[in-house]
Curated annotation (Swiss-Prot):
InterPro entries: CS_dom, HSP20-like_chaperone, p23-like. Residues 5-101 form the CS domain. The gene is wos2. Belongs to the p23/wos2 family. It holds the Pfam family CS. This is Protein wos2. GO terms for molecular function: Hsp90 protein binding; protein-folding chaperone binding. The keyword tRNA-binding does not apply. One of its GO terms (biological process) is protein folding. It comes from Schizosaccharomyces pombe (strain 972 / ATCC 24843). Residues 165-180 have a biased composition (Acidic residues).
Length: 186
């Protein structure tokens, strides 16, 4: 049985920093569901991925990068839905790459990852989050909390007191005879 090769959808975003290599990265998400034994070849100039997906699908893509990346520092993770890469740019620069690929073509399978995208002029103001998942619980200390509330003081508040039932103030309902009962009431 011959498998048709498909090009997977690829999402990308980037950060740039001329002083900190850790903030000079490309985030790349290659959408291959249920990737089976993916073959990944990462060089400074390009990324080549070839993988089966499930029983009937085959995916392959080659991305020739706009500039070189640092292969030694770069890393990836394979999940059940995609392959996620953090690729470190080799050249430290403040400006964003104008595009991911060398070619100035509009590639139908390549899209901006707006979940990870930050505008070039706003990237320093963004909090650092783990690229491999949600950043955990946010810091709520700035919200001020409950203002030192002492819950032990709630016991002295009024309301229905001990032994007093709130339903005592309502009139009693008359008991109704059961209709259709075979038993004789005495």
């Amino acid at each position: 049985m011959s498998l048709n090769t498909q090009i997977p959808e690829v999402l990308w975003a980037q950060r740039s920093n001329k002083d900190d290599a850790e903030k000079n990265v490309i985030y790349l998400t290659v959408l291959i569901p249920d990737a089976v034994d993916p073959k990944i070849n990462l060089t400074p100039e390009k990324l080549v991925i070839d993988s089966k997906s499930g029983a009937n699908a085959h995916y392959a893509v080659q991305i020739d990068f706009f500039k070189d990346i640092d292969v030694e520092k770069s890393k990836y993770s394979v999940t059940g839905r995609y392959i996620f890469f953090v690729l470190y740019k080799k050249e430290l620069q403040e400006e964003f790459w104008p595009r991911l690929t060398k070619e100035k073509l509009r590639l139908h399978w390549l899209r901006t990852d707006f979940d990870r995208w930050v505008d070039e002029d706003e990237q320093e103001a963004q909090p650092e989050v783990s690229p491999f998942g949600a950043g955990g619980m946010p810091d709520l200390s700035a919200l001020g909390g409950m203002g030192g509330m002492d819950f032990s003081q709630f016991g002295n508040l009024g309301g229905a007191g001990a032994g007093e039932d709130a339903s005592d103030s309502e009139p009693e309902l008359e008991e109704e005879e059961e209709v259709g009962s075979n038993e004789k009431k005495e």
